[in-house]
């Protein structure tokens, strides 16, 4: 018989939210791309960018490109919600657009953007993520 244990579920959600915060802080804000292996499964799938990211090495390459284009990037988590093995975060990003990124030529201007990520955990690592980022600010 399966029983509902709200304490167990709450503790898992809290753990996943903690991992999500550490993931953003270490990978993006502290620029520790090699730490990705501590947060992501080897077959991570990151959906929502122009090109889908598949696998740990692709993810690290994608982050390196982001950090190259926006070297002073700082992400602040503004909201987070968790349910079972998923966490959603709403974030704000502040950066300077120093190098060409996607189809956007470098402007050398400071900007602020916002986005949402849904992170799906397998065990204690992120297996899949969906991201939606307001890229329109780069066209201004």
Language model features with spans:
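C-terminal and inter-domain tail/linker signature
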Residues: 2-140
